[in-house]
């Protein structure tokens, strides 16, 4: 049995939708147990409501220490200037105790992301996220080109070999496309399959 955690932060719901697709893909692998959780919102509730932040997300809030309970963790974040969102950074900055114990060494780490525009930092968001995972000793997994959606040239679409991505649009009105969700499902299935092999 391999335990997979899909851990995300989503301000307007795009990454939440992608997280559900990632989890769906992971659950398609027999012998895996998949959990979806999110990191806490750090924006004060009144300001979050005033700016249209999606506060009704069903996933429970994770605590840093519980990351050690999983064989693979698939992280999802929107971009902030080519990096992960501050809410995710705040969460990961609380994992020093796990680092001291080597609690995440050898576990799979994978990342998916969203950006406002086609060239808004999808790849840098994921690759900069990898630095934290490498410091924790995690095994990085992306999306191989055996995923057909990565070479889709018929539409504007997210999706990178580093991880699944979606384009939200500058005003957040664009929702994840079928191709982007298919890549997210592929990533979840790919990570879960590898986690099962590692867990033995």
UniProtKB/Swiss-Prot annotation:
Cofactor note: Binds 1 FMN per monomer.
NCBIfam families, alphabetized: flav_wrbA, PRK03767.1
Tagged with keyword Flavoprotein: yes
Keyword Lipid biosynthesis: no
PROSITE patterns referenced in this protein's UniProt entry, alphabetically: FLAVODOXIN_LIKE
Gene3D superfamilies recorded: 3.40.50.360
Keywords: Flavoprotein, FMN, NAD, NADP, Nucleotide-binding, Oxidoreductase
Name listed for the protein in its UniProt record: NAD(P)H dehydrogenase (quinone)
Residues that hold substrate according to the record: 99
Catalytic activity: a quinone + NADH + H(+) = a quinol + NAD(+); a quinone + NADPH + H(+) = a quinol + NADP(+)
EC number: 1.6.5.2
InterPro entries the UniProt entry points to: Flavodoxin/NO_synth, Flavoprotein-like_sf, Flavoprotein_WrbA-like, FMN_Rdtase-like_dom, NQO
Record-annotated Flavodoxin-like domain positions: 4-191
Cellular component annotations (GO), alphabetically ordered: membrane
Annotated positions binding NAD(+): 12
Enzyme class: oxidoreductase
Family: Belongs to the WrbA family.
Species for this entry: Paraburkholderia phytofirmans (strain DSM 17436 / LMG 22146 / PsJN) (Burkholderia phytofirmans)
Cofactor needs: FMN
PANTHER family named among the record's database cross-references: FLAVODOXIN-RELATED PROTEIN WRBA-RELATED (PTHR30546), FLAVOPROTEIN-LIKE PROTEIN YCP4-RELATED (PTHR30546:SF23)
Coiled-coil stretches: none
């Amino acid at each position: 049995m391999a335990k997979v955690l899909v851990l995300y932060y989503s301000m307007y719901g795009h990454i939440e939708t992608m997280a559900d697709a990632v989890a769906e893909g992971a659950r398609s692998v027999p012998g895996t147990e998949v959990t979806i959780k999110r990191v806490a919102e750090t924006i004060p509730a009144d300001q979050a409501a005033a700016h249209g932040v999606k506060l009704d997300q069903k996933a429970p809030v994770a605590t840093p220490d519980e990351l050690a309970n999983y064989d693979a963790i698939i992280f999802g974040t929107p971009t902030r200037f080519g990096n992960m969102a501050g809410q995710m950074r705040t969460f990961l900055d609380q994992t020093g105790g796990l680092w001291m114990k080597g609690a995440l060494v050898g576990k799979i780490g994978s990342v998916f992301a969203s950006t406002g525009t086609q060239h808004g930092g999808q790849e840098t968001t994921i690759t900069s996220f990898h630095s934290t995972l490498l410091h924790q000793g995690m095994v990085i997994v992306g999306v191989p080109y055996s995923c057909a959606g990565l070479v889709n040239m018929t539409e504007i679409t997210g999706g990178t070999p580093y991880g699944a991505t979606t384009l939200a649009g500058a005003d957040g009105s664009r929702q994840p496309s079928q191709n982007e969700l298919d890549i997210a499902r592929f990533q979840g299935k790919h990570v879960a399959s590898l986690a099962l092999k590692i867990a033995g």
